[in-house]
């Protein structure tokens, strides 16, 4: 099955028809939920980044900061997964053939992997990471880069609707 065939099949399913038939209210509701998830994700990622960088939150250990914000980050990512999946079901071809969508998914996977790795690493060796967060510039650069990646994800998500800015690079341009 090609990606186009899968998109056509998905667009013909009852959930997709429901979203297409009720797009005047369903899509804005789903997008609002998605935006709330983005806000929670960015807030959590920002606070953790500030703590790792030693800029804020130094009154708590790195492990405490992780315990405080990682559940919010995880929950928000699950919310984004659910709302994002519904947005894909509503317009599968638009999403699947969008360079912005593909790049966004790649960066989401990268950021989720980094967050998971870092979370497990801190939980296993909290003293090591606590000391390292106070003196290691590379760790600060990684934290800041991760935050910039989350911002890029937001940018790419918004640009799904304007994927033609990529011109011939976009798979959508090659489709049509």
Regions found by a protein language model. Name each.
Residues 1-176:
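Polytopic transmembrane helical bundles with strong interfacial aromatic enrichment
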């Amino acid at each position: 099955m090609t990606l186009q065939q899968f998109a056509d099949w998905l667009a013909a399913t009852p959930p997709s028809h429901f979203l297409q038939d009720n797009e005047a209210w369903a899509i804005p509701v789903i997008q609002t939920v998605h935006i709330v998830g983005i806000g929670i994700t960015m807030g959590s990622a920002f606070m953790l980044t500030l703590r790792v960088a030693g800029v804020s939150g130094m009154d708590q250990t790195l492990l405490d900061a992780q315990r405080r914000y990682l559940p919010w980050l995880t929950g928000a990512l699950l919310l984004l997964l659910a709302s994002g999946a519904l947005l894909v079901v509503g317009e599968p071809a638009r999403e699947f053939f969008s360079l912005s969508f593909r790049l966004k998914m790649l960066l989401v996977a990268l950021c989720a992997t980094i967050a998971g790795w870092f979370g497990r690493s801190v939980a296993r060796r909290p003293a090591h990471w606590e000391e390292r967060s106070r003196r290691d510039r590379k760790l600060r650069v990684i934290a800041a880069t991760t935050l910039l990646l989350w911002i890029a994800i937001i940018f790419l998500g918004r640009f799904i609707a304007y994927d033609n800015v990529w011109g011939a690079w976009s798979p959508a341009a090659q489709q049509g």
